[in-house]
Amino acid sequence: ASYKIHLVNKDQGIDETIECPDDQYILDAAEEQGLDLPYSCRAGACSTCAGKLLEGEVDQSDQSFLDDDQVKAGFVLTCVAYPTSNATILTHQEESLY
């Protein structure tokens, strides 16, 4: 399956909808489609790529950085997040984690 992922951040001038297969990380799909999103480790072990899920669902079981409260609040590490539905993600949210 493939899902539509709406990536948005007014401050960064981002308002794009990408196609993302359910077996591809959202960060990788965004890069393939020409979007320049922040990242560092690409392994789910830091917060550089963090976004916030505004709607929809992802599988980010590969991540090891976010705590349960942050996950419940909707934070998502785009470098290890597979989409499980159409979703809207607010990008560049590392600073909001703290």
UniProtKB/Swiss-Prot annotation:
GO terms, biological process: electron transport chain
Highest rank taxon of the organism: Eukaryota
MF annotations from Gene Ontology: 2 iron, 2 sulfur cluster binding; electron transfer activity; metal ion binding
Subcellular location: Plastid, Chloroplast
Cofactors named for this entry: [2Fe-2S] cluster
Domain 2Fe-2S ferredoxin-type: 3-95
Family: Belongs to the 2Fe2S plant-type ferredoxin family.
Subunit (UniProt): Forms a complex with heterodimeric ferredoxin-thioredoxin reductase (FTR) and thioredoxin.
Name used for this protein in its record: Ferredoxin
Species this chain originates from: Cyanidium caldarium
